[in-house]
């Protein structure tokens, strides 16, 4: 979104960060503050799960109306003011206080259609104001809804927003609270995977809300197990599927279908997505009306990545990856005052390993991944958002939608799961029209991935000469990394690449590559893996695998009589 200037943008980010913190933790990091419709804040426990874990039948296609947004500028901003639309004066006041002046392209394109009562599928690049685009009309729907009677034991939920991850859910709720500054009677709550269900049930009963933001699995839990919740959902007038492509990529088809079945057919539905895959189009036939509109805010020929982000890749053997990363970071830190770097790793445990190593190398590093509790992740996310001269090592929990301002460099270590994930990761930089840089670091046997991004402006970078001093420092740092971290990273690495079909075809070769990764961590012998884990991976009896002692035989029968 546009604003008065840098000061108002900074102020807005600070407000949002505080609200996210309130939504996910209290003073001791163990609770949740939730704005209710009685102007008070209610507390509940936070949870620990990363995202809810898990597709869509191909119905006969229909042809929706298409709205194409043609812009001569690369900017995501438009010249349209918010007060040019019939929005509530109190909402406009909140927008003004937040420093917003003009709309983004996606907001300008979708708002008039939504206000006409249309369902929409909106495609837009990341960081272009999609969240506010669906929140503004959602708030208007709440304002226009008839007030619930005071003796109603199950006051209706008017707006239901479904997000794929807890981070996105909390961020959307924080944005909503900014816009609701002058609407104290409108309550917002968040229900997310991993929290204690009874605590959320008590909070929902004690502090009814009109806007509910949720992750799919937890929402289904409430539909199935929370008294009166299904009745409350029958009041839904607006359903939002945020990051629809990500929801489907994560296998949430059944949950989405269950959610759609639980809300009234007479409703408005908005699907917002950075990419529009066949799966997204299929879910449209289930969720949207036949006359829904497709709003494409990506210019034809503009590409799927931001043009102000330079993209390059390096091909190097695994034994050079850590020292190359260290050299890349040192150069970037030297060249960029106030640098802000995000490093994406293939798994949570590899993330932990890389963060541990960079910490041993005296870099200012933080880590976020699914194995960290939500209170920790919220605190680190907030710190990274507000800080400069900092490095965040993360798994894909930070790949989509999360808004970190002023990220100067994104490094992707190892094979992205697919083209879309590469694009979303890269989208953490170059946001709000700013410049950024992206580097993809691959091993020679991962080079096949480049064919999937050959239409993107990504160029090959030659490898720098070996910096022997840097290599020594990295080797010393790896020695200091905890052995348990190396063992967990090895097992997770093997599991991740076992899921990559082109690599996993030859299991003997896969294990050879895993052992190469083990050596890159400074280990002369690869870690042993329990036989039950190897069985689940389909890697039993593969040459080169070490079975953990004590796990390769069936447990002996216990003689209870001798006790």
Swiss-Prot record:
Region Disordered, as annotated, extends over 21-57
In which residues does the motif DEAD box occur? 242-245
What is the enzyme's class at the highest EC level? hydrolase
Positions bearing Phosphoserine? 25
Organism field: Arabidopsis thaliana
GO MF terms here are: ATP binding; ATP hydrolysis activity; RNA binding; RNA helicase activity
Q: Where is the Helicase ATP-binding domain?
A: 111-294
Report the InterPro entries cross-referenced here.
DEAD/DEAH_box_helicase_dom (IPR011545), Helicase_ATP-bd (IPR014001), Helicase_C-like (IPR001650), P-loop_NTPase (IPR027417), RNA_helicase_DEAD_Q_motif (IPR014014)
Binding site residues for ATP = 124-131
Annotated motif Q motif, positions: 80-108
Domain-level remarks: The Q motif is unique to and characteristic of the DEAD box family of RNA helicases and controls ATP binding and hydrolysis.
What family does this chain come from, according to its entry? Answer: Belongs to the DEAD box helicase family.
Q: Which SMART domains match?
A: DEXDc (SM00487), HELICc (SM00490)
**What protein is this chain from?**
DEAD-box ATP-dependent RNA helicase 25
Which keywords fit this entry according to its UniProt record?
Answer: ATP-binding, Helicase, Hydrolase, Nucleotide-binding, Phosphoprotein, RNA-binding
Question: Some GO term, biological process aspect, for this entry: which one?
Answer: response to salt stress
EC annotation? Answer: 3.6.4.13
Q: Where is the composition biased (Basic and acidic residues)?
A: 23-56
> What residues does the Helicase C-terminal domain cover?
328-479
What superkingdom does the record give?
Answer: Eukaryota
Chemical reaction(s) catalysed: ATP + H2O = ADP + phosphate + H(+)
- Give yes or no: UniProt keyword Phosphoprotein: yes
């Amino acid at each position: 979104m546009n604003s008065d200037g840098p000061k108002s943008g900074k102020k807005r980010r600070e407000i949002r960060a505080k609200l996210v913190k309130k939504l996910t933790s209290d003073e001791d990091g163990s609770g949740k503050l939730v704005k209710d419709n009685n102007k008070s804040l209610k507390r509940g426990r936070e949870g620990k799960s990363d995202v809810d874990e898990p597709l869509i039948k191909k119905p006969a296609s229909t042809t929706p109306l298409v709205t194409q947004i043609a812009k001569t500028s690369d900017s995501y901003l438009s010249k349209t003011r918010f007060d040019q639309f019939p929005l509530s004066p109190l909402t406009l006041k909140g927008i003004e206080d937040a420093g917003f002046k003009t709309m983004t392209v996606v907001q300008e394109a979708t708002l008039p259609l939504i206000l006409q009562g249309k369902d929409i599928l909106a495609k837009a690049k990341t960081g272009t104001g999609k969240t506010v685009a669906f929140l503004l009309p959602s708030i208007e729907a709440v304002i226009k809804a008839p007030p619930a009677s005071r003796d109603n034991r199950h006051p209706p939920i008017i707006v239901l927003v479904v997000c794929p991850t807890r981070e996105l859910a909390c961020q959307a709720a924080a944005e909503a609270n900014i816009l609701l500054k002058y609407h104290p009677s409108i309550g917002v709550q968040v229900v997310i995977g991993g929290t204690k269900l009874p605590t959320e049930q008590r909070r929902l009963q004690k502090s009814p809300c009109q806007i509910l933001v949720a992750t799919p699995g937890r929402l289904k839990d409430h539909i199935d197990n929370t008294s009166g919740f299904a009745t409350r959902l029958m009041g839904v007038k607006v359903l939002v599927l945020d990051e629809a492509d990500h929801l489907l990529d994560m296998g949430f088809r059944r949950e989405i279908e269950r959610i759609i079945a639980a809300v009234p057919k007479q409703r408005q539905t908005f699907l917002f997505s950075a990419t529009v895959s066949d799966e997204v189009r299929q879910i449209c036939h289930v969720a949207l009306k036949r006359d829904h509109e497709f709003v494409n805010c990506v210019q034809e020929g503009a590409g799927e990545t931001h043009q102000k982000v330079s993209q390059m890749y390096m091909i190097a053997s695994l034994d050079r990856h850590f020292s190359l990363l260290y050299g890349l970071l040192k150069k970037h830190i030297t060249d960029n005052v106030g640098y802000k770097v995000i490093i994406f790793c293939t798994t949570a445990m590899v993330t932990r390993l890389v963060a541990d190593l960079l910490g041993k190398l005296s870099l200012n590093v933080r880590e976020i991944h699914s194995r960290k509790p939500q209170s920790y992740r919220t605190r680190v996310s907030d710190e990274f958002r507000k800080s400069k001269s900092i490095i965040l090592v993360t798994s894909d929990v930070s790949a989509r939608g999360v808004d970190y301002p002023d990220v100067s460099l994104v490094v992707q270590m190892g094979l992205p799961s697919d083209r879309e994930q590469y694009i979303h990761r890269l989208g953490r930089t170059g946001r709000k029209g700013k410049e950024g840089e992206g580097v993809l670091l691959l091993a020679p046997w991962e080079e096949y991935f480049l064919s999937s991004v050959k239409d993107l402006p990504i160029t090959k970078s030659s490898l720098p000469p070996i910096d022997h001093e840097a290599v020594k420092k990295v080797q010393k740092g790896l020695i200091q990394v905890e052995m348990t971290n190396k063992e967990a990273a090895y097992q997770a690495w093997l599991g991740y690449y076992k899921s990559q079909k082109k690599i996993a075809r030859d299991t003997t070769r896969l294990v050879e590559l895993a052992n190469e990764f083990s050596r890159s961590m400074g280990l002369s012998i690869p870690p042993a893996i329990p036989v039950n884990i190897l069985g689940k991976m389909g890697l039993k009896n593969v040459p080169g695998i070490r079975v953990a002692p004590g796990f390769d035989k069936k447990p002996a029968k216990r003689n209870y009589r001798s006790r």
